Amino acid sequence: MDLSSLRPAKGAVKNKKRVGRGQGSGNGTTAGKGNKGQQARSGYKRPINEGGQIPVYRRLPKFGFTPIDRKSVTTVNLSQITRWIEQGLIENELGVIELKVLCHASNADYFKVLGNGEITAAVKITAHGFSKSAEAKITAAGGEAVTAVRTLEEAARVRDLAVEEALLKPKTKLVKRVKKNQKP
């Protein structure tokens, strides 16, 4: 076998359909486009127009909506955390910022730990959420599951605190200051 004997598979190469080359060819005159009108012309055709038939966007019902404040959640399984421990990337504590780095999630803001897999090392894990099974497995191994209150973006905006501390600090409600009327 050599390069000169290679051929494409049967049926893989088709001849180009040559249109507008005389009536005898079967595709002459109007070149298979019918008579006059928008669709006989070259260029743009309205993709929505279905020629009198109710178009698909009106045949199908409206469905659902997208909440504007939805948080995108990045999930991490216990099996992945165990792998990181075995590789020596984690020693005894795993914070939200380390999760962001280890997951290669540059725009992730909210992390949830799921209970798929087993964990044997006693590790303190800080994340925004834990499944019940993950929390049970972590505490059974002698570790600690700490729930972060703020997202990374919110924690970065807190003044006078490091990001790690701000993640755990509860949000305070704004208190409206009311001036008391002075008695005359």
Curated annotation (Swiss-Prot):
Which residue intervals make up region (Disordered)?
A: 1-50
Task: Tell me a GO cellular component.
Answer: cytosolic large ribosomal subunit
What residue spans carry the Gly residues bias annotation? Answer: 21-35
Picking any one GO biological process from the record gives: translation
One Pfam family per UniProt: Ribosomal_L27A
Looking up SUPFAM superfamilies in the UniProt record yields:
Ribosomal proteins L15p and L18e
Keyword entries, A-Z: Ribonucleoprotein, Ribosomal protein, RNA-binding, rRNA-binding
> Which GO molecular function entries does the Swiss-Prot or TrEMBL record give?
rRNA binding; structural constituent of ribosome
Partners and quaternary state?
Answer: Part of the 50S ribosomal subunit.
What the entry lists under PANTHER family is as follows: 50S RIBOSOMAL PROTEIN L15, LARGE RIBOSOMAL SUBUNIT PROTEIN UL15M
Belongs to which family?
Answer: Belongs to the universal ribosomal protein uL15 family.
| NCBIfam families in UniProt | rplO_bact
What is the stated purpose of this protein?
Binds to the 23S rRNA.
Protein name per Swiss-Prot or TrEMBL: Large ribosomal subunit protein uL15
